[in-house]
Swiss-Prot record:
The keyword Acyltransferase does not apply. This is Ribonuclease P protein component. GO terms for molecular function: 3'-tRNA processing endoribonuclease activity; ribonuclease P activity; tRNA binding. The lineage of its organism: Bacteria, Bacillati, Bacillota, Bacilli, Lactobacillales. Its EC number is 3.1.26.5. Consists of a catalytic RNA component (M1 or rnpB) and a protein subunit. It comes from Lactococcus lactis subsp. cremoris (strain MG1363). RNaseP catalyzes the removal of the 5'-leader sequence from pre-tRNA to produce the mature 5'-terminus. It can also cleave other RNA substrates such as 4.5S RNA. The protein component plays an auxiliary but essential role in vivo by binding to the 5'-leader sequence and broadening the substrate specificity of the ribozyme. One of its GO terms (cellular component) is ribonuclease P complex. GO terms for biological process: tRNA 5'-leader removal. It holds the Pfam family Ribonuclease_P. NCBIfam families: rnpA. It catalyses: Endonucleolytic cleavage of RNA, removing 5'-extranucleotides from tRNA precursor.
Length: 117
């Protein structure tokens, strides 16, 4: 399961717009910034700092995040958001990444599934 390029935030200008909106939500593993837009679908940007490890490890984290977002796709609202990985995420399994990411996305009201957990 992959995310099409139209679902990704790629340009620096777009990242800056999302960060300048100052709507941020965080848990121990991730920070999410969001921006309400008039897009027909959501767009996601990923940010993994060099402090988290070498390129292979950072790319693994981004792959896990993209896969988790692809699984969450039916539950995501039509907004732009950026996910920033915090230290400690490099040791998590895919299931732990999904759990932590779902938690922070629910806090930000980006993930909506109708369940109260």
């Amino acid at each position: 399961m992959a995310i099409k390029k139209t679902y990704r935030v790629k340009r620096s200008k777009d990242f800056d717009q999302i960060f300048s909106a100052k709507h941020s939500f965080a848990n121990k593993r991730f920070v999410v910034y969001k921006l309400n837009t008039n897009q027909p679908h959501f767009r996601v940007g990923l940010s993994v700092s060099k402090k988290l490890g070498h390129a292979v490890l950072r790319n693994r984290i981004k792959r896990l995040l993209r896969h988790a977002v692809a699984e969450f796709k039916p539950y995501l609202v039509d907004e732009d958001f950026v996910i920033i990985a915090r230290s400690g995420v490099e040791t998590l399994s895919f299931e732990e990444v999904k759990k932590n990411l779902r938690h922070v996305l629910k806090l930000s009201k980006i993930y909506v599934d109708g369940e109260n957990d």
